[in-house]
């Protein structure tokens, strides 16, 4: 059942409130009695249950009051608006109860929220609506003329369907000179007439008499019924038949077959001839006795004519008459007691059943039912049970009522329905069993939050994606059902307030699909993470969250950028190489970076063009330009090299670096073309600026150290020296060239030539070819050594190791 259906969870219900509408709660176990006269028209008022329960009209309607009875026979109806209990139909006491007095119809009143039930009964009061009826309208009685006064002759009784005072009260006979009638009472309470002789008969005077027998009931006014009695005066017959015993008591099982011998009665007559011949018959037998038993008129055997039913008649009182041919008769009584056998299985009557039931409500009433067995004694005793492996409890109440309720809170996610079998067994031998199967459905309560399939998700997106690209999905499931299991997704506020999540991704609230809202740039944003929430639609709603990491995959969208040598058309970089250089001499190193990552940033170098092919070579992995052979005089003094720098992307991107190499015999008087003007500082990207600043700082520190050293040496020498001015290009030189993509920093020792100009107050100098080792923390580890090799006057060189 769906949580949106607003099911009323009936928790901790009052299960055993046996109060029925009284003034106090104590001592209310006795059922409340109501009465109605039989034959009252349908829809007649019986009582007002709302007043009896002490409930206001609104409360009465809210409690959902119901009236149920055994077998769900609807003799009563309840007006929910007024609380009036009305007759559903006209009641006939004789049809409902027969001769049973009092005639009581039991019913139950059920209330909900909380659950209660009460016992009640409706007594149907008899009215005198039936007259006495003689089954035999004519009776023949033979009386011997020698019968003395006071002799009694039993007559057949009348039947009256009414009970109590409306039943037969007495019998009267029409006026005559010989007989009167006495009203006798049997052990079962029924009354029968007995004809008593008051005056001796004389057949010669009067051979027969015709009398009218009248049966009167006790109603007001009384009703009556009549029968004709023919009295035949017979000649003297000295002896009447006599039974061996006047009273017989026998027991017979209710499952005895038809024609079963119940008992054999026997009578004798001491007369001889036809006066001694005896015949047997039922005397004053009711319609039920006549249908149930038969008597062999010659042998006196009493046999069954139909099947017995203990539940309808527990005993029969049968009168047997033995009559001789002379008209004399004798009477005996046979009391037949029916023995109950276990021939009725228990019955289960369901009064209330609730399904589905909420999963989180313990002690919720599921069903109210009653059990019964038409048998008696041990055969009518009942035990009731359910399966042991179910979370339900069966409690006994009053009047063979049972309540089935939940023992513990249920979990719909573990089990959504239960098949409950109510087993009712009597204690007979063998016992009979009745099974009642019920399917109890468990309604859902929003007690499970959505659960993501993963605690965290990692999504990969290639940069330069198209906007609205589906980049992945998150998924959450909810073990509940219905609207409680409908999951909606949302983006939670990012923990990083600077992350513009709303402009980066969006999520489909229904299926959890994630979309990139704009094109991503790996160089600007390599990765970001955010949280995704999943909420159900229960009331109240439950939610959970998961972490989503988005990794931007690099695309080869950046060409290599050459850091050194600087590519400036107005001030080309010129490297000096002595002609005496050995093969493998390090000319310079091309340093380049790539804004991409991974293999897109793996750079390789190759010599694209050269003035003298085969003179120089470029190492593919580190960009070092070295001499490939010995230099000769035939080699041009000026060499132009074009180095191709290519990444490993697909497709690859590339850049070129142009190098100018000047072959010199020595470093004393190198020739370097002066630039026309110092190049303006271009707009560089941030990485280039950082590297240039770092290089400039290191170079300045080194120049200061060299100047200090030179100044000290100059002070110690007295003679002046004249040296040629060295012309070098202006501009920044990198002090610490690093391949940021894994090519490594320069690892060779660097040789610096310092040229000083004579006659200058400041004695400027420039280093021409820095070959610096790895510098950690901008400190020089090895000590400086001075080379005492002088050229053209005053000159010196420094070497850093």
From Swiss-Prot:
Domain of life: Eukaryota
Residue numbers on the Extracellular membrane side: 30-691
Name used for this protein in its record: Protocadherin beta-8
Domain Cadherin, chain residue ranges per copy: 36-134, 139-243, 248-348, 353-452, 457-562, 569-672
Species in which this protein is naturally found: Pan troglodytes
SMART domains for the chain: CA
Molecular function GO terms recorded: calcium ion binding; identical protein binding
Function: Calcium-dependent cell-adhesion protein involved in cells self-recognition and non-self discrimination. Thereby, it is involved in the establishment and maintenance of specific neuronal connections in the brain.
Pfam families per the UniProt record, alphabetical: Cadherin, Cadherin_2, Cadherin_C_2
